[in-house]
Amino acid sequence: MIVRNIGARLGRRALATPLSRASFPAQSRFLSQDNFTAPPPPPTNSKKQAAKTAFAEPTLEEQAEFYAESIEKHTPEFAASPAAEAWSAPSATATETVTTWDPSLVDEEALKLKQQIEAIPGNFKLFKQTKAQTQKLGAGVEVRYIPEQYLRNPPSDASLEDLMAAQAHMGHNTSLWNPANARYIYGVRQGIHIISLETTATHLRRAARVVEEVAYRGGLILFVGTRPGQRPIVVRAAELAKACHLFTKWRPGTITNREQLLGGVPLTVVDELDRPLSGFEDHLHDRRPLAPDLVVCLNPKENMTLLYECSLAKIPTIGIIDTNTNPSWVTYQIPANDDSLRATALISGVLGRAGERGQKRRLEAAQRGVVTWKTPADVQGYFELASARAADARRRQAQDNSVEEQKEKDTFLSEDALKAMFGGDARI
């Protein structure tokens, strides 16, 4: 196509036949002394003829002349040899030899064609075998995403590829953004902010480290996700980290007024190996309900009240911050797409695995006799009060025992006292 276009446009100018001498009067007078009585006829080659001449197949004489000129130009020694005369013009014998029809050539062509036809079944069989062996190479469609994969077996860490596949980089429209999230935004595409996945991975690892250390220190973690579809996500994360979960609407005052809202929730006192301890019924009945030591919120936009109560109670929080969310609401931000269930499942799975590692480390240390957490102040106060009460009870018991012994002494007289009272001959 390219050569044909070039020839059609430039063939007449580059490859057309040379003009006649009549077109150049000065040169004609210089080269010849003939007087022309009439002007030469105009050139008869049109555009079609010029294109035909340009793309016409060269004759045998033209080819021989071209080869002779090339050899003479490039090899001067060959031009002086007798063999160079053979290239000056083709002989009649050579022309007849080329143009003579040879029946043997037809027989060879037919034999080759017959061999090719006979080889078709074998080639087709080989093609089928090769196709069966290589049909799964490079073209197999593999199931890369299973909706339950982050619930059944959550990963311990999230790579940039995992975050990209989970659409964690997709933000909101540029008109809905919060300027405080400018440090987390990578750029804009089609009117949507793109979150930097490198920043997301860094903040996610930091939050996972916080969850692991809180679990290692025996803290109580609360996973919150109140959007539709987040229920199995928070439940699975809480199971891994041995934490609490909330997938319904947050009741205002659950932290700041927990005496009234959580007064009837049963509690259990355990030792360093998570074995229940008895004898704390009075304390559990009188003590204040528990508050979480760390809150992980998957949708901070709908749980502003929860985050505000956590700030009042000085409880650290971890939240997924989208481009339209205020990052100052939480203590540890994870910039990501909070509208994608796949992204929230990936992030909560990583945090759940971190809590699982922390719990495992705590139990291993407890088996070695190392306690990684401190007894709460209220429980410690109950211990001190119970010890004081026990000491007071023992002191009173000792006093009572001494009084009883004195009474017994006063009731029963000794033998010497009886002799002194009744004389030496007194007998009992």
Swiss-Prot record:
One of its GO terms (molecular function) is structural constituent of ribosome. InterPro entries: Ribosomal_uS2 (IPR001865), Ribosomal_uS2_bac/mit/plastid (IPR005706), Ribosomal_uS2_CS (IPR018130), Ribosomal_uS2_flav_dom_sf (IPR023591). Residues 30-50 are annotated as: Disordered. SUPFAM superfamilies: Ribosomal protein S2 (SSF52313). Its main location: mitochondrion. One of its GO terms (cellular component) is mitochondrial small ribosomal subunit. It comes from the Eukaryota. It is found in: Mitochondrion. One of its GO terms (biological process) is translation. Keywords: Mitochondrion, Ribonucleoprotein, Ribosomal protein. Disulfide bonds: none annotated. Component of the mitochondrial small ribosomal subunit (mt-SSU). Mature N.crassa 74S mitochondrial ribosomes consist of a small (37S) and a large (54S) subunit. The 37S small subunit contains a 16S ribosomal RNA (16S mt-rRNA) and 32 different proteins. The 54S large subunit contains a 23S rRNA (23S mt-rRNA) and 42 different proteins. Component of the mitochondrial ribosome (mitoribosome), a dedicated translation machinery responsible for the synthesis of mitochondrial genome-encoded proteins, including at least some of the essential transmembrane subunits of the mitochondrial respiratory chain. The mitoribosomes are attached to the mitochondrial inner membrane and translation products are cotranslationally integrated into the membrane. Belongs to the universal ribosomal protein uS2 family. This is Small ribosomal subunit protein uS2m. The lineage of its organism: Eukaryota, Fungi, Dikarya, Ascomycota, Pezizomycotina. The gene is mrp4.
